[in-house]
């Protein structure tokens, strides 16, 4: 079992032989989808792998509705694909260029108060700060709170050493790719 990071990595590992590749972003997208539409099942899976933060009587319930995706890399694309099955509408903000595919509003630029307003964050139920930069993701959270303090805030934490900063930011849900993989493998082994 190996972490699927990109096309080059997949190609390299395919030469090794039988290797099961797991993408933390695809797994997380499925988990978020489950948390929105079957929250108790999602909470039960987390409880099985020993997540101390799980409350089976009050499972995490990300809201249904329109979302803003900040960053349309591997995580943003996986979330877009998984949640589109339920006709979730997205506004996508990405600085690296126009998103290649997907429906909804696409905004090219860095995430700031203006682009969040253009993406209609004030009318959205949630925001995903899903870039590959922890600093950028924290900055996105702070900007998002000024536009819609009631939005469900989901953030990607890339490096464990930034845990204190992410906990202080008080996002509704923190996604750590390495933790997603570890828990998925543990659940697979149970």
Model-derived features: where do they sit?
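Cytosolic regulatory regions of ion transport systems
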Residues: 1-190
């Amino acid at each position: 079992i190996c972490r699927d990071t990109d096309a080059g990595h997949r190609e390299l590992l395919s030469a090794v032989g039988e290797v099961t590749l797991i993408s933390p972003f695809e797994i997380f997208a499925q988990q978020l989808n489950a948390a929105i539409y079957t929250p108790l099942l999602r909470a039960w899976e987390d409880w099985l792998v020993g997540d101390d933060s799980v409350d089976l009587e009050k499972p995490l319930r990300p809201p249904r509705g329109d979302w803003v995706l900040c960053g349309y890399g591997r995580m943003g694309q996986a979330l877009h694909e998984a949640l589109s099955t339920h006709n979730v509408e997205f506004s996508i903000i990405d600085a690296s260029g126009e998103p290649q595919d997907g429906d909804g509003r696409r905004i090219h630029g860095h995430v700031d108060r203006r682009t969040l307003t253009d993406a209609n964050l004030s009318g959205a139920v949630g925001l995903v700060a899903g870039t590959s930069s922890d600093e950028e993701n924290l900055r996105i959270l702070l900007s998002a709170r000024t536009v819609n303090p009631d939005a469900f805030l989901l953030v990607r934490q890339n490096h464990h050493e930034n845990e204190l900063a992410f906990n202080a930011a008080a996002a509704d849900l923190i996604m750590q790719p390495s933790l997603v993989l570890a828990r998925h493998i543990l659940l697979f082994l149970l």
